Amino acid sequence: MPSAVVHPDVSVVITFHREGLLAHKSLLSLSRCRAAAERAGVGIEIVATLDRADAETQRIVRDFDAAGKPDVLLAVDVGDLGESRNNAIAHASGEWVLICDGDDYLSEDFIVRCVQSAGKYDERTILHPELIVMFDGWAAISWQPEDNDPAFHADCMLVCNPWNSCSFARRTTYTDVKYVRARPGESGFGYEDWHWNCETHAQGYSHRIASGTVHYVRKKSHGSLNQAHADGHALIHRTKLFDIAP
C-alpha cells in the first residue's frame, strides 16, 4: 500500500453510509485509479466519511488495506450527503478535488484524464465524466453534455440535472460553493448535486467533460437516495440560476 502523500495533487472525496460489502468494491476501484495516477506522477489522497454508517460498512472501510485505503477517515453524524462532502472537503489538502460515492466505480485512468483535461481550462472549470454506465437495478448508458454545446441551454436545469454527482474541480470551487443540506423528509428540499450544478453555473463556472472518462453508477432497485428524493416529491433549494423572484 502506498504511503500517504504529503502534498497531494488530488483529494478524492468519497462518502459512505450503509453500503456494506459494496464499499469494498468501490475502494478496489479507487485502488486502481490511485495506482494509475501515481504511475503518471499524480499524487493522491483519499478523504472518506462514515456518516451514520452501519457496523458492516465501518468494518469494511476501516479494515481495507490496499491502495484505496482512506488517508483521512472521518466519522460524522450529520445524516446528509452534502454536509458529509463539505466535512471531507474541509479536511482535504489537494489542489484538486474529485467527488465520488461509496457504491460507484471509476475507469482506471479517470483521475489521470481529469488532471490532463483540467490543464486545458481556466481555474473556474468543473469537469464531469464523459460516459455514465448504469447497472444493477437497471442498465443504461448516457453521455453528459458540456455547457458550451450549442444544444445545451441552462433553462433545462429548471426540470432536470444535466450532470451527475461525480465532479472534478479545484478545491476552492467546493469551498466557495458548498453543498446544501438536502433532507426532503424534513424540509421538502433535496437533490444537492442538482442544486450545486445550478449554483456553480449561475456563478460563472464552466462545466466541461474530461474526455475518455467513465463513471459506473449503481442504480439500486430500492433504497437509493435519489429515489427517496423522488418518492418524497423533493424540490431543489432556491438557486441563483432562477433567482427572478424577490
Put a short name on every predicted segment.
Residues 76-92:
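Glycine-rich, basic loop-to-helix element that forms the pyrophosphate-binding segment
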Residues 97:
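Short aromatic/hydrophobic "clamp" motif used to bind/position activated sugar donors
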Residues 134-139, 210-229:
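Active-site donor/metal-binding and catalytic loop motifs
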Residues 19-35, 60:
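Short, well-formed alpha-helical segments that are part of the catalytic scaffolds
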Residues 187-196:
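Acidic donor-binding loop at a coil-to-helix junction in glycosyltransferase catalytic cores
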Residues 29, 47-60, 101:
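A conserved acidic beta->alpha catalytic loop
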Residues 150-169:
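A recurrent flexible, glycine/aromatic-enriched loop bordering the glycosyltransferase active site
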Residues 109-141:
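Conserved donor NDP-sugar-binding/catalytic core segment of glycosyltransferases
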